[in-house]
A protein has these predicted regions:
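Short, well-ordered surface patches within globular domains
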Residues: 26-92
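Bacterial N-terminal signal peptides that target proteins for export
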Residues: 1-11
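Aromatic-enriched hydrophobic runs in primary sequence
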Residues: 7, 25, 70-74, 96, ...
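N-terminal low-complexity, intrinsically disordered segments
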Residues: 2, 24-26
Length: 178
C-alpha cells in the first residue's frame, strides 16, 4: 500500500512538472502563469511576504511602452538608455514612470520587459527576465536601509507593438506601515 501511494505521488509530481514545463495549466493565461512563477520565486526569496497581483496600472504601462528602450538582444532594458536617457528615450521612460506614480512611496517599483519570440514558454520568459535582463527602477525609497515589506505586488501582460510581442512585468515592494 505504501509503495502504491509513493508511485502515485511520483506520477502526480511528474504530471505537475510536465504541466509547468509545457505551459499547459488548466487554461490559465500566459500573464497569470508569469505572475505565478514570479510569485513562487519571490516568496522563496522574500520569506512570508504576501504576493498579490492587483496592479491595474499595467495597462497604462503597456500603452506607454516603447520597444526602443530594450537592449539590442531584446531581453531587458538597454542599460545605457535607462541610466543616461536623452531625447525620446527620456520621454518614454517618463511616461512609464508616470503610469506608476501611485506607487512612488513604495520601497521599490521595478519594470521588466523583453521581446517574446513565438513559442517561448512563460517559464523561460521569467527565467530570462530574472537572470538575464536589466530592469528599470521607476521609484526607490530605501534610504536608511531596506524596510520590512508588507507585500509584493506583481502584474504581467503581453503586448503587441509593431508586429512583435513583448512581455512586461511590474514588481512593487510595498513597505510595512511604520
Amino acid at each position: 500500500m505504501k509503495l502504491t501511494k509513493k508511485l502515485l505521488a511520483m506520477a502526480l509530481a511528474g504530471v505537475m512538472l510536465l504541466t509547468i514545463l509545457t505551459g499547459c495549466s488548466s487554461g490559465k493565461s500566459g500573464d497569470r502563469l508569469v505572475e505565478e512563477y514570479l510569485a513562487t520565486f519571490f516568496s522563496e526569496n522574500s520569506g512570508d511576504v504576501p504576493i498579490t497581483h492587483d496592479v491595474p496600472e499595467i495597462k497604462a504601462v503597456a500603452e506607454n511602452f516603447d520597444p526602443s528602450l530594450l537592449a539590442s538582444n531584446g531581453i531587458g532594458f538597454d542599460a545605457k538608455v535607462i541610466h543616461n536617457p536623452t531625447g525620446s528615450a527620456s520621454d518614454n521612460l517618463q511616461k512609464l514612470k508616470s503610469a506608476l506614480v501611485n506607487y512612488k512611496n513604495c520601497t521599490n517599483v521595478y519594470l521588466y520587459a523583453m521581446a517574446v519570440p513565438e513559442g517561448l514558454s512563460e517559464l523561460t520568459q521569467v527565467t530570462l527576465l530574472l537572470y538575464y535582463s536589466s530592469y528599470y527602477t521607476a521609484y526607490t525609497n530605501t534610504t536608511g536601509g531596506l524596510p520590512t515589506l508588507d507585500s509584493i505586488k506583481c502584474a504581467s501582460t503581453l503586448v503587441k507593438k509593431g508586429g512583435k510581442q513583448y512581455r512586461l512585468v511590474v514588481l512593487i515592494q510595498v513597505p510595512a506601515a511604520s
